[in-house]
Design a protein with these regions (language model features):
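Segments forming oxygen-rich coordination pockets for charged ligands
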Residues: 1-208
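Short acidic-hydrophobic, aromatic-tinged amphipathic segments that line or gate anion-handling sites
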Residues: 212
Length: 212
């Protein structure tokens, strides 16, 4: 299992390289409680395929419906990046399953450039930290390798987010508790290495295991 952001970007890059319409959604602002933190991303293909998440599920369903039915009045049509806000009213928050008082704002990028996505994924595979900046008016994207992670910045016409290598966790011993801990760590963005000379302990793990 790989880092969730890399997983999302890799699938998005593959879809775009194949000529498929797709969008990239990112959580850029939240008010009150939010199911996913700022910077969380999701890729949505024209076929309805989804990788990643921006909420507990209801917002994803709404995005799929609006992106897949372009004839509807509230459809999400290709074009310049778009800001979309959910949970403005109590009724809307309840309908989309947002926590009490929760509101979130998404940046939607339609059909990101395939070559730029492939370059981004390549840098991430090499273990580099990358700062990606989107111009909301034009959709132009600037990507550059950076030395350290920075929080998402939404200022003026630009949104900048950092993507980079996972934190690393080393576990000594491949017992049952280590398996549970490793699984939780993977879901929280860690690259996990488990060291244990007992090969029989590695046979039934549900995630990638290194033994030594």
């Amino acid at each position: 299992m790989e880092n969730l952001d890399v997983h999302v970007l890799r699938h998005l890059a593959q879809w775009r390289a194949q000529g498929e319409r797709a969008l990239l959604a990112a959580v850029v602002r939240t008010w009150g409680s939010s199911p996913r933190p700022i910077g969380s991303i999701m890729a949505l293909g024209a076929s309805g395929a989804v990788v990643g998440s921006v909420s507990g599920g209801c917002i994803e369903d709404d995005l799929i419906a609006r992106y897949s039915h372009a004839s509807d009045a509230d459809a999400l049509r290709d074009g310049a990046p778009r800001l979309l806000r959910y949970g403005v009213s109590a009724d809307e928050a309840h309908r989309f399953g947002l926590p009490c008082g929760g509101t979130l704002e998404l940046l939607l990028e339609f059909n990101p450039d395939a070559a730029a996505l492939q370059q981004l994924v390549q840098w991430l595979d090499e273990g580099r930290m990358v700062r990606r900046t989107v111009d909301k008016a034009t959709g132009q994207v600037a990507q550059q390798v950076s030395d350290a992670p920075e929080p998402l910045v939404h200022a003026g016409q630009q949104v900048a987010n950092s993507f980079g290598p996972e934190y690393r966790m080393l576990l000594i011993g491949a017992g049952q508790l280590s398996e549970y801990l490793a699984t939780m760590a993977l879901f929280n963005g860690f690259a996990v290495t488990v060291c244990d000379p007992r090969e029989e302990y590695s046979r039934h793990w549900s995630c990638l295991l290194y033994t030594s």
